[in-house]
Amino acid sequence: DGVALAIYNIEKRGQSVVIGDQTGIGKGRQAAAMIRYGLLSGYLPIFFTDRYTLFSDMYRDCKALGIKEARPLVVNAGVSVVDFDHVVEQKATCTSDEIWSPADEEDNEKYEAERMALYQKQYEVVYKAPKKSVLQDILIKGELPQDAFDYLMITYSQLKDAKRDMTRLNFLMALCGQHRVLFIFDEAHKSSGVNAGKASVITQGINMILEETPQTQCVFLSA
């Protein structure tokens, strides 16, 4: 029902929708369904979430819905997407780029990095972020390499430095000008926040994109 209502709001009303089911009810599967809908309907889906280790959970849901071949651009440098159904033998530590996060990232960053390293060793890596230099080139150019990626995976933390470095925000803005974009905001409450009466940098950045590109569609998911 949540997916049907989201699609109805997009196609008939041009409006966003909030899917607010409780934890464990299946918001991830609904988010994957919206990625699938976007791919089949000519949108460029952009999946935002709170933690980059959740990219692998989203891949699991996409796989269950028959779109495991859809190729994500992982915007978080050094991060991999793994297949939990394929355990591999222990091997040497992955030589991926160091995982980048803004300087003011929360204390759980160390835990996330350790979990990602464990994922990379224990499970088959199906997708990973491009090398840092390649990724930076994509971001600066503000366009996706032709026929290389089908959707994006990114965390809210990538916009925390937007006041100092507009590269990622400008990249997203450019994509919204070039494509019909469908944002899927997982853990949407994590993107909001008010400090000293002002909206967070993340919220301001997302609002700026939506104001400048009114044709962009959104789905918000939050328990």
PLM region spans:
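An acidic- and aromatic-residue-enriched active-site/binding cleft used to recognize and process polar
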Residues: 22, 28, 50-52, 188, ...
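Hydrophobic "anchor" residues on beta-strands that sit immediately upstream
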Residues: 16-18, 151, 182-183, 218
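Conserved ATPase "switch" residues in P-loop NTPase domains
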Residues: 10, 39, 210-213
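Conserved helicase ATPase motor motifs in RecA-like P-loop NTPase domains
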Residues: 24, 189, 210-223
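Walker A/P-loop
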Residues: 14-34
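SF2 helicase/translocase NTPase motor core
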Residues: 39-208
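Active-site signature of alpha/beta-hydrolase-fold catalytic machinery across serine-
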Residues: 4, 33, 37
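Conserved pre-motif I regulatory segment
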Residues: 1-20
